UniProtKB/Swiss-Prot annotation:
A matching Pfam family: HD
Biological process (GO), any one: dGTP catabolic process
Protein's name according to its UniProt entry: Uncharacterized protein YdhJ
Database matches in CDD domains: HDc (cd00077)
Molecular-function GO term, any one: dGTPase activity
Domain HD: 49-151
InterPro entries in alphabetical order: dGTPase-like (IPR050135), HD/PDEase_dom (IPR003607), HD_domain (IPR006674)
Length: 325
């Protein structure tokens, strides 16, 4: 099959990867928006988990990763629920890892093990431990394919960087001992600035935070009134929305009708309607300098200051005042 990606271009995919892409769990991700509630308050915020999963697979391929690691990259988000990380707010999961906690359960009860076995791969061996896949995932604050793709993809799609900038950065990535690094402090500084546009300016955008808060309230009410079950959250965003809208539950419907692109909110630390904090997301990639690996912030005052500002903002959270619902 031929696939076309806005960042990585045209690629021919066959064999096990083609079958996995066509499988129901991966196809479902076309109906899961990356930004959770974001698309309900801004129709342009519509990157899907499917686009990101394909992107992670292609980035691992570009960096010379094995087919096995490409498989892990393609499948790493299949257990994301409807509305992505909104569900972490619903279940008050501060680590924002609900989807990781149910990953094995979702995989086992799908056709994925049969597809892998058909092509000579063992599900347990491939998918039981992400730490094996050092291009795919690294603990923060290092770079990895997952973190890199969602940052470049969102920021390109939402107009904060251009395609040339994204592709230039990708050309400045090097791989050492199975891990990815920027090849210069300039490349590191550029990515750090873009990453904080993503996790501070976008994730903590007052409109975005409002959408998360009110959709989480709607889902909590729906679960409390047995309008939906936790299992329903493994449907697509639209399927769950359809259930909520058809419920005739006044509390759920009232909350849903308050989530739309016309809402007006501001940050106000004094007269606020609600406060929300998200998972601390910091980036400080290592670079190779003077024959040793060193954190970018140890070389660049710019990276250090950006990291400190992001830390303080994330620690404080966002205080939202509603002007118009």
């Amino acid at each position: 099959m031929e696939i076309s990606d806005i960042i990585y271009g045209q690629h021919h995919i066959d064999g096990v990867l083609e079958e996995l892409i066509k499988s129901a769990p991966v196809q479902r991700l076309k109906g899961i928006y990356q930004g959770g509630a974001s698309f309900l308050v801004n129709r342009k915020w519509n990157v899907t988990r499917y686009e990101h999963s394909i992107g992670v697979m292609l980035l691992i391929k570009k960096l010379g990763g094995t087919i096995e690691e490409q498989i892990a990259g393609l499948l790493h988000d299949v257990s994301h629920t409807a509305f992505s990380h909104v569900v972490d707010v619903v279940f008050e999961n501060q680590a924002e890892d609900y989807h990781e906690n149910i990953f094995q359960q979702v995989i086992v009860h799908s056709e994925i093990p049969d597809i892998l076995q058909k092509h000579g791969y063992h599900t347990e061996e491939l998918l039981s431990d992400d730490s094996r896949w050092t291009l795919l995932e690294q603990p923060a604050p290092e770079l990895c394919a997952d973190r890199t793709d969602y940052t470049l993809r969102d920021m390109y799609r939402y107009g904060h960087i251009n395609l040339h900038e994204a592709q230039t950065f990708l050309d400045h990535l090097i791989v050492r001992n199975g891990r990815m690094f920027p090849d210069s402090i300039e490349a590191a500084e550029w990515f750090v600035s873009v990453y904080y546009k993503e996790v501070i300016d976008f994730f903590l955008n007052p409109v975005n935070v409002y959408g998360y808060e009110y959709l989480a309230r709607a889902l909590k009410a729906a679960l409390r009134h047995d309008v939906i079950s936790a299992e329903d959250l493994l449907k697509t965003d639209q399927e769950v929305l359809n259930i909520l809208r058809a419920s005739k539950n006044e509390e759920v419907l009232s909350l849903l009708t308050s989530i739309h692109p016309g809402i007006q909110v501001i940050e106000d630390d004094i007269q606020y309607d609600f406060h929300q904090k998200k998972k601390m997301r910091l980036i400080d990639p290592s670079i190779f300098l003077d024959d040793k690996w060193i954190k970018s912030s140890g070389v660049s005052e710019k990276v250090r200051k950006m990291g400190e500002a992001a830390y303080q903002k994330a620690k404080k959270g966002v205080y939202i005042k509603i002007l118009k619902q």
